Amino acid sequence: METLRYRFDGRNGARTGLDHALVGVVASGNLEVLVERVPLGGAMEIEIVTAARGFGEIWQAVLDDFAARHSLQDVRISINDVGATPAVVSLRLEQAIDVLQGADA
C-alpha cells in the first residue's frame, strides 16, 4: 500500500450541506471517497491510500484538475483506492462534493 498526501490552498467555502459524505465502494477497480468539513486554516487536504504503487504523478494531475475546479476551504478528502482509473477518481470526487453540498449523487 502507498499513502499519498496533498494540500491545496482553498479559495471558496463548500456550500452549506452535510458535515461529511461517503461515496464509492472499495472493490477491484474502484475506490471510496470520504469528504469532511474540518478546520484546516482554509486549506483542502487530500490523503490517498492505494494498492497501486508508483502513480503519484497521475494522482497529482487528477487532483490538480479537481482543485482547480473545486478550490474548497476547510475540507479533508480521504481516498481508499484499489486501482481506479483517473476517470473513476474524478467521477467519485465530483459525486462526493455534490453529496457534501446537498445534491443527490
From Swiss-Prot:
Statement: the UniProt record of this protein carries the keyword DNA repair: no
Family annotation (Pfam families): ACP
UniProt modification remark: Covalently binds the prosthetic group of malonate decarboxylase.
GO cellular component: cytoplasm
Keywords for the protein's UniProt record, in alphabetical order: Cytoplasm, Phosphoprotein
GO molecular function: acyl carrier activity
HAMAP family: Malonate_deCO2ase_dsu
Similarity annotation: Belongs to the MdcC family.
Function: Subunit of malonate decarboxylase, it is an acyl carrier protein to which acetyl and malonyl thioester residues are bound via a 2'-(5''-phosphoribosyl)-3'-dephospho-CoA prosthetic group and turn over during the catalytic mechanism.
Protein name: Malonate decarboxylase acyl carrier protein
UniProt organism field: Xanthomonas campestris pv. campestris (strain ATCC 33913 / DSM 3586 / NCPPB 528 / LMG 568 / P 25)
